[in-house]
Amino acid sequence: MAWRGWAQRGWGCGQAWAASVGGRSCEELTAALTPPRLLGRRFNFFIQQKCGFRKAPRKVEPRRSDTGTSGEAYKRSALIPPVEETVFYPSPYPIRSLIKPLFFTVGFTGCAFGSAAIWQYESLKSRVQSYFDGIKADWLDSIRPQKEGDFRKEINKWWNNLSDGQRTVTGIIAANVLVFCLWRVPSLQRTMIRYFTSNPASKVLCSPMLLSTFSHFSLFHMAANMYVLWSFSSSIVNILGQEQFMAVYLSAGVISNFVSYVGKVATGRYGPSLGASGAIMTVLAAVCTKIPEGRLAIIFLPMFTFTAGNALKAIIAMDTAGMILGWKFFDHAAHLGGALFGIWYVTYGHELIWKNREPLVKIWHEIRTNGPKKGGGSK
């Protein structure tokens, strides 16, 4: 669930200001100068007020080093990213702001699937060598004294008992936990807002489309997303395979953020978003499309079960209604974009993209076998 950022901030005043405006009280001056606050879930932009009096010259204050803001600036709910220190201004040409994200989405998706195809080739090649290495290792283990109660042995046992899907998403979960910890560092707040929240009104448009997929400010938000990803990990990896799943997941994060950009530009509701929900919606939609008769249940209400197909229809209907009615708590455009991409990929995309990877794999095989061609003239 990609969260919208919001903040509210007022202006203070001093005795010198009250004297310069004809004896108006500090409270009256504050009310007159206070810009529109950022209310609700929508990130509204500050509008500069025009005043009918001359303002006293401002004292030049020494520039503070960017070592973070005061603790008061971030005393807020754990669900709300501290965005009051960063103001985003919408482009006067909003459609143009989508050109770079569009090219980035297409280019990144192509690179993701190309890298996954090469990764699969290398994995298959290494399995043959690993097979013989495994035989040798088993023989050495049989004659080597075994350590009982060794912590490393217990970790290896736990890891070996995981499914391929669970092993794959363990790395994704670790990355999300790392980014969550970075949000807790005050000196990194500006960097996190700039690069780990996606917003078409920001100066940085492309890299946040990927990085925000691993970004969660709320512990509950991250825990809920990672639980859903863990629950569907075995099914999706059994359907797609490890390498193809990673390409789909990363591409889904970028594609869902691009759909979010389009929705924000179309409605004018700008605001930073973050979270893995767009990519997770792709995983959920792909599994529910492939296994529509599978039974699902809610974590705290296991007595109520429903089919995967019905669950997918309900989620799409809710996100569509959220977009039309302007619900602001979730980024419904990102959710809907991720779900539609998941449905499209398992229905058509696998045939169009993954099964046509052979030319790229052959080129890579020739490079690995013969090495790069040497230039120059004849010997």
Swiss-Prot record:
The active site is at S277, H335. It is an enzyme of class 3 (hydrolase). It comes from the Eukaryota. Pfam families: Rhomboid (PF01694). Its main location: mitochondrion. Its EC number is 3.4.21.105. GO terms for biological process: protein processing; signal peptide processing. Residues 1-52 form a transit peptide. Residues 53-101, 188-207, 263-273, 319-332 are mitochondrial matrix. It is found in: Mitochondrion inner membrane. Belongs to the peptidase S54 family. Required for the control of apoptosis during postnatal growth. Essential for proteolytic processing of an antiapoptotic form of OPA1 which prevents the release of mitochondrial cytochrome c in response to intrinsic apoptotic signals. Required for the maturation of PINK1 into its 52kDa mature form after its cleavage by mitochondrial-processing peptidase (MPP). Promotes cleavage of serine/threonine-protein phosphatase PGAM5 in damaged mitochondria in response to loss of mitochondrial membrane potential. This is Presenilin-associated rhomboid-like protein, mitochondrial. It comes from Pongo abelii.
